[in-house]
Amino acid sequence: MFKRKDWLIIVIALLLALGLFVLTRSGIQFGLPGDNDPMRVLTEINPPANADTIQEPVQAYLVLNVGNTRYKPLPLTREAIYRLHQSDGRDNVIHVTRDSVYMESANCDNQDCIKQGMVDFVNRDARVLSNMIICLPNQVVLELMTPEEAGVNAQ
């Protein structure tokens, strides 16, 4: 009925299917090089109807890490609230201003990321976590950086 090669093909197909299943369930995010725009995973809550027309130099950047993915620095040009919703239901709400960031809410159990408070350029050297806010259960790390630290030219 089935020859040796048929069984080999069936076993290989099953192993490939099992491997893909494990990869999709592991939470590892895959993307194309250059596909690390933070606005791909962030949704602004109540964006303003009209954007500011005054172009001031960017003083701060938010670097977002979700799981194993590090996103490009997001310039902080105005006050905004962003929602980070992951496909497995993990949610974080991030509040940013031109020079600060804090975790407004999260659906993690311990809420340590919210208790870490605001990071700005005045307090970041005195904080235990320096310029970072970390949500371990949701695998989210927020970093407040200067343009030089973020590796971008000051605008």
List PLM regions with ranges:
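Short, Lys/Arg-rich N-terminal segment immediately upstream of the first membrane anchor
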Residues: 1-4
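Hydrophobic membrane-insertion alpha-helices, especially the h-region
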Residues: 8-25
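Aromatic-capped interface at the extracytoplasmic side
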Residues: 22-36
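Short extracytoplasmic/periplasmic juxtamembrane "stem" segments immediately C-terminal to an N-terminal membrane anchor
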Residues: 34-64
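Glycine- and acidic-residue-biased ligand/ion/polar-headgroup-sensing regions
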Residues: 60, 89-110, 138
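Extracytoplasmic/periplasm-facing segments of secreted or lipoprotein envelope proteins
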Residues: 61-91, 98
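N-terminal post-signal-peptidase region of extra-cytosolic proteins
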Residues: 79-81, 113-124
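C-terminal partner/receptor-binding element of secreted or periplasmic proteins
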Residues: 125-155
